[in-house]
C-alpha cells in the first residue's frame, strides 16, 4: 500500500524529470555556433585524413614497392594535425579525434550530447576524406589506403597496449599545452600537438600503424572493407586518452578551487547523513564546462560551478571545448 503514493508521484514527476534532464543535456546544441563547430570538426577531419593518408600511398605499386618512408609519413601526419588545430581550434576546439573528445567528456569540458555530434562528424569526415583519396589515386598503387593493421608478429593485446601508450602521450600533451593555469607556455600549442603526433608515428608505425585516432582508422577501414583487429583502434586510444586526461586534470594539476568545492560538497553530504534524511533541491542551473578555445595570445577560462566565463562568451551561454 505504501508504494502506491510513491508510484503516483513518480508517474507525475518521471516524464517531467526526464524532459528536464534531456533539455539540460542538450543545452546549447541547437545553436548556430555549435553547428559551426560540428561542421568544423567534419571539415578538419576530412582534410586531415585526405592529406595524411596520402603520404602512406606507395607509388611503386605492388610489383615494385618503394621502401616505407617513416619520416615522411610521421611529418605529414604531425604537420597536418598541427595545421588543422591552428585553422579550426578557435571554431570547434580542434579535437579532430574521437579519443580526445571522450577525454574532454570525462574531464567535464564538453557534454555527452555535444560529444555525440562531434564524434559523428569526425567519423563522417574521415570516411569522405578516405573516399576522396581512393577516387583520385590510381588503382595500381592504392594498396591498403593507409588502413592501420597490427604487425604480424604482435598479438592483439600488444597492439592494444601500444595504441594506449602513444595516445596517452598525445592527450597528456594536449592537456598540458592548453592548461590555463600555466604561465610558462609561450610556444605554439598546435605545433606541440603536431610534434606529439609525429613522435607517436615514429615509434609505432611498424607496430600498429600508429593510429592514436579512432576516426583516422575508421575512414579507410570503411572504404577498403578491412576490419581486421579494428576494435584495437577504438579501445586502445580511448582508454589512453581517458587515463591521460584524468591523471592530468585530477592528479597532477587539479584545479584548487574545484578541489575545495568537492571537499565542501562531500562534507555537507556527510553531515546530512548523520541527521535526518533530507531531500535537497538545487535550483542552480547545471552548466557543464566546455573547455578552452585556442586563440593566439588568449586563454579562455570558465568557472566550473557557476558557468562564468572571463572571455569570449558564446551566445548560447556556453563555450565550445578545445584541445
Swiss-Prot record:
Bilayer-crossing regions: 37-57, 70-89, 116-136, 156-176, 185-205, 232-252
Source species, domain of life: Eukaryota
Main location: membrane
Positions in the Extracellular compartment: 58-69, 137-155, 206-208, 223-231
UniProt-listed GO biological process terms: cerebrospinal fluid circulation; intracellular water homeostasis; multicellular organismal-level water homeostasis; protein homotetramerization; water transport
Pfam (any one): MIP
Subcellular location, record wording: Cell membrane; Basolateral cell membrane; Endosome membrane; Cell membrane, Sarcolemma
Span(s) of short sequence motif NPA 1: 97-99
GO terms for MF: water channel activity
Lipidation (S-palmitoyl cysteine): 13, 17
Tissue: Detected in brain and lung.
Recorded topology in the membrane: Multi-pass membrane protein
Intramembrane: 94-101, 209-222
Modified residues (Phosphothreonine): 289
Maturation and modification: Phosphorylation by PKC at Ser-180 reduces conductance by 50%. Phosphorylation by PKG at Ser-111 in response to glutamate increases conductance by 40%.
Glycosylation sites: 153, 206
InterPro entries: Aquaporin-like (IPR023271), Aquaporin_transptr (IPR034294), MIP (IPR000425), MIP_CS (IPR022357)
Cytoplasmic domain ranges by topology: 1-36, 90-93, 102-115, 177-184, 253-323
Motif NPA 2 in this chain: 213-215
Purpose of the protein: Forms a water-specific channel. Plays an important role in brain water homeostasis and in glymphatic solute transport. Required for a normal rate of water exchange across the blood brain interface. Required for normal levels of cerebrospinal fluid influx into the brain cortex and parenchyma along paravascular spaces that surround penetrating arteries, and for normal drainage of interstitial fluid along paravenous drainage pathways. Thereby, it is required for normal clearance of solutes from the brain interstitial fluid, including soluble beta-amyloid peptides derived from APP.
Family note: Belongs to the MIP/aquaporin (TC 1.A.8) family.
PANTHER family attached to this UniProt entry: AQUAPORIN TRANSPORTER (PTHR19139), AQUAPORIN-4 (PTHR19139:SF34)
Subunit structure as annotated in this protein's UniProt entry: Homotetramer. The tetramers can form oligomeric arrays in membranes. The size of the oligomers differs between tissues and is smaller in skeletal muscle than in brain. Interaction between AQP4 oligomeric arrays in close-by cells can contribute to cell-cell adhesion. Part of a complex containing MLC1, TRPV4, HEPACAM and ATP1B1.
Name the UniProt record assigns to this protein: Aquaporin-4
Species this protein is from: Bos taurus
Lineage summary: Eukaryota, Metazoa, Chordata, Craniata, Vertebrata
Protein encoded by which gene: AQP4
Amino acid at each position: 500500500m505504501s508504494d502506491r503514493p510513491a508510484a503516483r508521484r513518480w508517474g507525475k514527476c518521471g516524464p517531467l524529470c526526464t524532459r528536464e534532464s534531456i533539455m539540460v543535456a542538450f543545452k546549447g546544441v541547437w545553436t548556430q555556433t555549435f553547428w559551426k563547430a560540428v561542421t568544423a570538426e567534419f571539415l578538419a577531419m576530412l582534410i586531415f585524413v585526405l592529406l595524411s593518408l596520402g603520404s602512406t600511398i606507395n607509388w611503386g605499386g605492388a610489383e615494385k614497392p618503394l621502401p616505407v618512408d617513416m619520416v615522411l609519413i610521421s611529418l605529414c601526419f604531425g604537420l597536418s594535425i598541427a595545421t588543422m588545430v591552428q585553422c579550426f581550434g578557435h571554431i570547434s576546439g580542434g579535437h579532430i579525434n574521437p579519443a580526445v573528445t571522450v577525454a574532454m567528456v570525462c574531464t567535464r569540458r564538453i557534454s555527452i550530447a555535444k560529444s555525440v555530434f562531434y564524434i559523428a562528424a569526425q567519423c563522417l569526415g574521415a570516411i569522405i576524406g578516405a573516399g576522396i583519396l581512393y577516387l583520385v589515386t590510381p588503382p595500381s598503387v592504392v594498396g591498403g589506403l593507409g588502413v592501420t593493421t597490427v604487425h604480424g608478429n604482435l598479438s592483439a593485446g600488444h597492439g592494444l597496449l601500444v595504441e594506449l601508450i602513444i595516445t596517452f602521450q598525445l592527450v597528456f600533451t594536449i592537456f598540458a599545452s592548453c592548461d590555463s593555469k600555466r604561465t610558462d607556455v609561450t610556444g605554439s600549442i598546435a605545433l606541440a600537438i603536431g610534434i606529439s603526433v609525429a613522435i607517436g608515428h615514429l615509434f609505432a608505425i611498424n607496430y600498429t600503424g600508429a593510429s592514436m585516432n579512432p576516426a583516422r582508422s575508421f575512414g579507410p577501414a570503411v572504404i577498403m572493407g578491412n576490419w581486421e583487429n579494428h576494435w584495437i583502434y577504438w579501445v586502445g586510444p580511448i582508454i589512453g586518452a581517458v587515463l591521460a586526461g584524468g591523471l592530468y586534470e585530477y592528479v597532477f594539476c587539479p584545479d584548487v578551487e574545484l578541489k575545495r568545492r568537492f571537499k565542501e560538497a562531500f562534507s555537507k553530504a556527510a553531515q546530512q547523513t548523520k541527521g535526518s534524511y533530507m531531500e535537497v533541491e538545487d535550483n542552480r542551473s547545471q552548466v557543464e564546462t566546455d573547455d578552452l578555445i585556442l586563440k593566439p595570445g588568449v586563454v579562455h577560462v570558465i568557472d566550473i560551478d557557476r558557468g562564468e566565463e572571463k572571455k569570449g562568451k558564446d551566445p548560447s551561454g556556453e563555450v565550445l571545448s578545445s584541445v
